[in-house]
Amino acid sequence: MGLPANLYIDEEDKQTMIFAYPNLFTDASSLQVIRLEIGALAAWTPAELVDIVPYAAEQYPQLFKQKAVSVLTVSPERTFWEKATILHHEANRPEHLSMPQRYSRHYYDLYCMAKSPVKDKAFARLDLLQKVVNFKIKFYPRAWARYPEAVPATIKLLPPLYRLDTLQEDYTSMQNMLYGEIPSFKTMMETVEELEEEIHAL
């Protein structure tokens, strides 16, 4: 759009860089900025180089001299266990504490990974689950999250029943952020339940 980049440090979280990008419309279901969490409290191992092709380059290849860019990113096996421990955290959230907005994305992300080869790769790296748990206990301690119970035999992915209505509303409000074939809330949660059972059997 010919506008300068608007980059700044988040005042509430000094380890996060904010990129406020030009937009043609707003949507209450999504953040209107990109958050780059690049501080010391972000775990980067294991990591790998991945080629990313923007959607714009796929749709208008004639406009791009370079369609792909290599990005160093955390391996999907670690992301799988990061997401699983987020769900464990939410399963143990006290009833008087509200679940943050847009948290249904974590259930959707884990649903997608459970349907991909990432699941088996993550299952083969249970050491990463322990590393994620240790990291969160050290840097994000919350007694009620019960991180020591986030081991294969006792990890919890499903939220309490009283959270489901709110979670479903959140998921419905986020539909504009999702691409392709979008699973129903029921299908997504059934897959998460099956995944929890699979992990318990490891």
Q: How would you describe each model-predicted region?
A:
Residues 1-202:
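Structured mid-to-C-terminal alpha-helical surface segments
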